[in-house]
Every structure is written in C-alpha cells, then in structure tokens.
Amino acid sequence: MDRGSFAHRFFCRAFSASPSFLRSPRAARRAETGQSLALGYLDIAPSALTPERRIPIGRLRLWHVVLLLLILVLPVAAQEGRLPRLDDSAQVSLITYTPGEELYQAFGHSAIRIKDDLLNMDRLYNFGVFDFETPDFYLKFVHGDLFYQIAVTPGEEEIRMVGAYGQGVSELLLRLSQDQKQRLFEALETNLLPENRYYHYDFILDNCSTRPRDVLERITGSQILERGAGNQTFRQMLDPYFTRIPWIGFGISLLLGAKVDRPASPREACFLPADLERAVQTSENGEQSLTLERRELFPPEALADSSPLLGPVWVFSGVGIVWFLFWLFRRKGHSVFPTALCLTIFGLTGTFLLIVSFWTRLWVLHENYNLLWLIPSHLIAGLWMFFAAKRQPFLLRWYLKFAFITACLFLGSSFLLPQRFSPAVYPLLAILVWRCALELFPGRTGVRS
C-alpha cells in the first residue's frame, strides 16, 4: 500500500468523524441537509455523522497528534526502508569516457559508479542525459531552456557498450569512509526522484562533469580543484577538442561571446571530464588522497583527424586566392554580384548572432564581439546591391565606405578586444575589404565597367 495514500485516508476519516463545530459551515450544512461529504478518497454518508458515532474532542486531539506523527514519520521510514545499507566492501568510483565520434561525445563524459557485490548492485549515475525527442529541442538548447537529467544504468553493461563504440573508459576508485559511501548513495538516489532529477543545462557551469564534482565536494567536505589548467580561459581549454572537428569548432567559436575568454578558476576547470579526472586524482579526503587507484577499463580507439588543409582557415584562404585570380584575369566587365553576395552572407550570419546573443539565457553566448565585423545591416546593403545593379545610390556608396572602414579597423585592432577570435575570421575579413575596395575605387583597382 502507498503510505502517502494511507495517511491521506486516515486524515479524511479523522476529519469526517469530527464534531460539527470543527467542520466548516458548508460541510455542516451539507451534513444537516442529508448530502454526502466527499473528502479525498472517501464519500461518507450522513449516517456516519450521527452524534452516537462522533468522537470526543479529547480523543480527537490525540488522533491529530498521531496523525501528525504518521505524516512526518511514514515518508522517512519508507525512504530509509527503500535504500539498502551498503556493505563495507562497496566500491565508489568516478568513470570517465574519452571523446567519441558523435557531436555530443566531443568532450567526453563523467559518471559516478557504486558497486556492491554483496547486494548484487552495480549502478552508474549519469548527469548528462537528454532526449532528442523533446519538442523544439534545438530552440530550447540555444535559448537555455533545455532540461537535462540524472539517470541510472547497470554499470558493467554501460561501460562495455561505450568501450565497444571505441571510446576509452577509465575508472578512479575513490577513498571514502563507509558513512561517506552511504551518504553519497542516498544523495544520488534522492537526485533520481522525479522532482529532483531535472536541471537546466549549462555548457560550462552546470553539466555532466560539474554535477559529480559538486556531489563529491558535499560528501567529502573538500574542494575539487584542477590546478594543472594554469591560467587558461574557457575558450583555450575547449580549443584542443576542435582540432578533430574544425568546422564545428569554427561555428561554436562564432557563437561564444567574450565571457568565455576569462581565465577559469581551478574549480571551474572541472567542467571538462578529463580535467575533472585529473582534479580528483590530486584532491584529498581529509588527510588522505581521495583516489585509491586508476584503472583503464577500455583504451580509446584513434579517432579520424580532419586534414588542416580542409579546415576553415585554409579553405577560406584558398577561396579568396582563387577568387582574386579569377578577377585578375577576367575578360568580362565588372559585376557587383560577388560583393552583394559577400555582404548578404555576412549580414545574415550577423543577424543570427544578434538574435541569439540577446534572446538566449546562456551566458556563454552574450557579449559577442563578432558582431563588430558580422554586422547585421550588411544584409540590407547586400540585398540592395542585387537590385541596384551597376548603379550605386548615394546612401549605398556611403554604406560601402562604412563596411570598408569597420572591416579594416577590426583587422587592425581585434587583438585589443576582450574576445579571442578564430583564425578563420581573418581571411573572410580580407575578402570583404577587397570586395568593398573594388566598389569604392574602381579606377585604382583596374575595374572595367
């Protein structure tokens, strides 16, 4: 029987059997007129409310005391009865996955494992679970409204499955007292309750690595710090993970604002699974090391690397050079179409960044200085050029001067800004400067109309 339902029924019986002056006026009137009194799970007929069957006030107060004790004690007793007591030989460990092929595996993963052979229990607690079937998944992710959750899976099965996909799996056995193991187990199980399991995901400050860090800190009473990160910024810590996926890295770099260019504190540096593992290895539990030993359960398989020549820097540079050579040896007259296309693409990208940076709740996307060269109004100018053809209205010519000057200023002063930019930005800016110069100085650039 559900103990919560039992307590509710008990309360209904005590209330329905009470004297009329303890009932609400409406309930008393219903009883006097012969109507039934429906409370929760009960439907009590008027015959049950006769004076002979009412309970004396002294006994009623005693019932209220008993009721209060039941309401307070039963849920606690149920919770304690539901969770077993871990054996002294139970093992608690931090599981770390290396990066995998899929985008959501790009940074690896962290989980907590509790294994008790005596209880035949092997539970792996993951804080990075999400559902692709969530309505408007990508919109919610970008806006910062996507809920992640903690989930538990059989440890051995999960680890073998991950290893079979080629990801490396390592295990740090933790030195915890019996009381700390039990408290950790109870804390994780409490997190699994429906009202506790969901949380707002934060790419850096609240993810699958920071959650295990937080719960281990609460249990041990000590901070977990990654001192090996030095004075690196969040962006610098992410950069090595983008060498294999340069185009995705370029897109993420455009989205991330200046706030990720501040140095990460030793505690914040644990937002990456590999850094959390290093931090736990160097952390202490009281006067002893927090780690007993490290085991490599599955070695990582080599991931396919992308050729640097196919990355954004070389591709954009190559496009610019080929474009310039075609222009240099052209036979036909000048066309504004390439410049209009360039401005339209820049403006469209800037419009997207502007909307995202103001609309999102994610702090990592705020204060984006890429908007100084991906100017949203370029979109209007580019579309205008398509329709203006060779004729350049006065306002359009002034806007081309504005685009030329801002691009040149950005090229010369970007290193002074509080945000670090992808190297692929500079070939794109060089193309924009060149195309604007062709429109503004046709005689000096050898343009034939």
Regions from the language model: what does each represent?
Residues 83-84:
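Bacterial Sec-exported substrate-binding components of ABC uptake systems
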Residues 1-47, 51, 56-63:
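N-terminal basic, low-structured, amphipathic or hydrophobic segments
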Residues 64-73:
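Bacterial N-terminal signal peptides
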Residues 87-167, 365:
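Glycine-rich catalytic cores of cysteine/serine-nucleophile enzymes that process amide/ester linkages
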Residues 176-189:
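A structural motif
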Residues 190-449:
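Activation targets extended, charge/polar-rich intrinsically disordered C-terminal tails
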Residues 76-80:
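Boundary at the C-terminal end of the N-terminal hydrophobic targeting segment
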Residues 100-101, 166-175, 194-203:
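Second-shell loop/turn segments in exported
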